Amino acid sequence: MRPRIIVFLFQVLVVIKGTKLKYYNDELCGRQSTYTSFMLTDAAGNTGNPTHLAPWAVQIRVKARKGDFEVICGGTLITLKHVLTAAHCFQKHFGAKKEGGEENSMSGRYCESNQRFTDSEILTRTVVTVGAMCTRLEQKYGCVNEKQNGKTLKISRFAIGDFYKTHCEQGNDIVILELESTIDDVEGANYACLPFLPEVNIQSGANVTSFGWGSDPGKGFDNAAFPMIQVLTLATETLATCEENWGTSIPFDSFCTAEEEDKNVCSGDSGGGLTFHQSDSAREFIIAIVSYGSDCVQLIGGSEPRSQINTDVRKHQKFIVNFINQA
């Protein structure tokens, strides 16, 4: 994963099939950014302004008992003021039992509707860090300047898909957050293009990019956020292959990517985006939101890879547009 900047000083409206979308410009979205206020020296001794290869990446942080805001998930900026992430990031308990005591076939994904954070908890305990490369200063991993830690903003409102209403089993693992202010003045931040603005098609077998600060067992971060953003290229899979690998039906809004023993999204990467690079425009489009898959520690230990199941953003166009236009 990596970084780049763009400063936006205006609000833009875009017409989508007769609907205006606030805070979005399809000419400026999806472009990488550069930090202009400081310089870094790379491993080869070259000094320059660092670029942010995923300036739409954000950290979802929740206030812990000690008062610190811990990174629990990733997310993706989709306008100057809005973020997409996963609904299960706000789940209090995992592995609930169905009536009768049997766990479901989706790795304990079953839940009750009252197992998520309350609306008040989401608004008062959750913040979003934008324009960041790092979760904290740590020179060993190239996190040496405070500006690499981005800017943290509060959430003014949000909307959750029907994830909890269907016991966390039938898709809709999506949340859209509205930030208290725009990212106009945030160095290193930009938003990804939406896949229906303009419409983009992905060919079967194409690669997508994942980004986040999730755990990395291979580097000793088994249950902790990695200091520096990491970026991975993942191969897409057909829904048929995905269902075969899981041995059961998958959510209606699934978008699947291949798992590998040494290359996969891990705990803490949930809610982050999968983007598709459009070569002719050199821009990144968010296609999906990381939802669930195999445990990285188990994969490293030799477990058979299955498929990573993500939430297809294109299946939630109306949900996204309606929320943004209520701003």
UniProtKB/Swiss-Prot annotation:
Keywords linked to the UniProt accession: Cytoplasmic vesicle, Differentiation, Disulfide bond, Glycoprotein, Hydrolase, Protease, Secreted, Serine protease, Signal, Spermatogenesis
Record SMART domains: Tryp_SPc
Pfam families: Trypsin
Tree of life domain: Eukaryota
Glycan attachment points: N207
Enzyme nomenclature, EC number: 3.4.21.-
Keyword Signal listed: yes
Active site: H88, D173, S270
Effect of C29Y: In jn2; male and hermaphrodite fertility is normal. Suppresses premature sperm activation in a swm-1 (me66) mutant background
Compartments in which it is found: Secreted; Cytoplasmic vesicle, Secretory vesicle lumen
PROSITE patterns referenced in this protein's UniProt entry, alphabetically: TRYPSIN_DOM, TRYPSIN_HIS
GO cellular component terms, semicolon-separated: extracellular space; secretory vesicle
Reported impact of M1T: In jn21; in males, suppresses premature sperm activation in a swm-1 (me66) mutant background
Record-given protein name: Trypsin-like protease try-5
Native species: Caenorhabditis elegans
Lineage of the organism: Eukaryota, Metazoa, Ecdysozoa, Nematoda, Chromadorea
